[in-house]
């Protein structure tokens, strides 16, 4: 694996390899000294053309825990705001000796462009490009789900996939790079995925995605789900009215207090509620749901550091071979429900 640009082209073997390596990195986070010398002498650049405090800090923490040197580059106030191109910026970073570039860009495809050129000889990690993809968010979501799924089955999570897990991804799918990355990765891992959204917030061509589509949140919950991923309503990307009112949106597609109570009445005692953050409390998710024991929001933040440590380590370790797939036999033979 030379770059991490998309989950669509991530093989099952590589996906499980990243998740298993993240398990090892998580164990480091439980130690008193949360640091490894694995990337000492390497330089990781966080190249952010869009603001994202959470993702940048997570990548910075991941790189520093591996003893890498970190350079944070924000487009605001930089030469980029004066008209410098992506090519010129990349070549400048190459001259500084960057070994990995974590890029977030407003334009879909920018990380792929950077990786495909000879502007810089460095590993490229997509930290979110437009409305296209956000692979490390999908990986940390899958990591969180896999740990939960393994606990339910009483098996180790290492080597396991997500066969039989039912996942609903609900909300602003149209503008969500998280939804796209999650659909591809979760299907690769064997989960059954349902998108839940109003028709106005579903992208053209969604029928070709490897998932089912529903317009009814309550109907989806009634069919049974093991995890619900609530997506942020991205008002900053909307230049028109995509739903009547915020109150109507919350009532029909948000995870409110009534739906939180409904999980118990439906017998879904082990269903978890997820959100990539930041949350619009009272819109796509109620405070009661976000703060409930079912919520994995803080676990996702914690797991994000481990997953990003794994990605950086694997990309900079020099081993680009496709790993052999050795699934957890005990887990794979469990009867899915």
From Swiss-Prot:
Show the GO MF annotations: amino acid binding; aspartate carbamoyltransferase activity
Residues bound to L-aspartate are: 82, 177, 232
- Give the enzyme's EC designation: 2.1.3.2
Report which reactions are catalysed by this protein: carbamoyl phosphate + L-aspartate = N-carbamoyl-L-aspartate + phosphate + H(+)
Q: Enumerate the UniProt keywords alphabetically.
A: Pyrimidine biosynthesis, Transferase
N-terminal signal peptide: none
GO BP of this protein: 'de novo' pyrimidine nucleobase biosynthetic process; 'de novo' UMP biosynthetic process; amino acid metabolic process
Highest taxon in the source lineage: Bacteria
Q: Which pathway is it part of? A: Pyrimidine metabolism; UMP biosynthesis via de novo pathway; (S)-dihydroorotate from bicarbonate: step 2/3
Q: Say if the entry is tagged with keyword Transferase.
A: yes
Q: Membrane-spanning residues where?
A: none
GO CC annotation terms, alphabetical: cytosol
Asked whether the UniProt record includes Glycosyltransferase among its keywords, one would answer no
Which positions bind carbamoyl phosphate? 54-55, 104, 134, 137, 277-278
Quote the function comment for this protein.
Catalyzes the condensation of carbamoyl phosphate and aspartate to form carbamoyl aspartate and inorganic phosphate, the committed step in the de novo pyrimidine nucleotide biosynthesis pathway.
- Record family assignment: Belongs to the aspartate/ornithine carbamoyltransferase superfamily. ATCase family.
Q: How does it assemble?
A: Heterododecamer (2C3:3R2) of six catalytic PyrB chains organized as two trimers (C3), and six regulatory PyrI chains organized as three dimers (R2).
Q: What is this protein called?
A: Aspartate carbamoyltransferase catalytic subunit
Gene source species: Arthrobacter sp. (strain FB24)
